[in-house]
């Protein structure tokens, strides 16, 4: 190609590249700025199942609450990028939403406000010590009976269920109404409790969970009633109920480490027995995010 022609091609190429660069720069300068996704203002309420009591590491902010920084609220916040205020506290009852549970521990509802976007909670299991008493009574009866019969059911009958219906259920509803009043714009998720016992007795589990064979389904039915009370209270107050009855089946305290979400009463790997382990807290977070459509 003659030199004058070559120079013309090079000149045209440089001009074209320059025009393209100017065009991109101009387009970039006039493009609408990307809209950042708003950060969720997330408040976690609840008892030891929410706090992850027994799961390491422990939050040093308040050792009385035995709150883990690997609990399901932290997993949700880490996954979604939410701004977390975690006021969960081991042994909390619904009454602790409006009263100081310990000196220096404010009522849990004080953490809520009109700017709160998301609230999660697991609560009700400690109210009137009903469910704790059921586990303790049935465990003691199981040891004394050598695992035979249904001594706990025979002695207590419907008393635990009656207590849940008469006291726990209305207290749950009142607590959720309190959440709604303090955080009127928030999405509220009330979590059920993952299964502690299998559906039927497993003789190989007796040393870990010393329940008489006939009391295993009895205690599971009491837990099902507690979860149903949470469900009804949630539905009647506009909250979302997160049901664990299906996804936690086969992950109870009788299962092997790595499969179970709940640690057994005896010979477990957690500081707090009959509570979720680290795997359980992660699975609770994952299922809650699935139900709420969070990612």
Curated annotation (Swiss-Prot):
Regulation: Strongly inhibited by Ag(+). The cations Ca(2+) and Mg(2+) do not significantly reduce the lipolytic activity of SCO7513, whereas high concentrations of Co(2+) and Cu(2+) partially inhibit it. Is not inhibited by DTT in vitro. Is resistant to PMSF inhibition, except in the presence of Ca(2+).
Catalytic activity reported: a triacylglycerol + H2O = a diacylglycerol + a fatty acid + H(+)
Taxonomic superkingdom: Bacteria
Keywords noted in UniProt: Disulfide bond, Hydrolase, Lipid degradation, Lipid metabolism, Secreted, Serine esterase, Signal
GO annotation, cellular component aspect: extracellular region
Active site: 48, 275
Pfam families assigned to the protein according to its UniProt record, in alphabetical order: Lipase_GDSL_2
One BP annotation, GO: triglyceride catabolic process
The UniProt record lists the keyword Cytoplasm: no
CDD domains: SEST_like
Gene Ontology molecular functions: carboxylesterase activity; triacylglycerol lipase activity
The EC number(s) this enzyme carries: 3.1.1.3
Subcellular location: Secreted
Disulfide bonds: 65-89, 138-152, 205-254
InterPro entries registered for this protein in UniProt: SEST-like, SGNH_hydro, SGNH_hydro_sf
Activity's thermal dependence: Optimum temperature is 45-55 degrees Celsius. The activity drops quickly at temperatures below 30 degrees Celsius.
Protein family: Belongs to the 'GDSL' lipolytic enzyme family.
Role noted for this protein: Catalyzes the hydrolysis of fatty acid esters with a preference for long chain fatty acids (C16-C18).
Entry protein name: Lipase 2
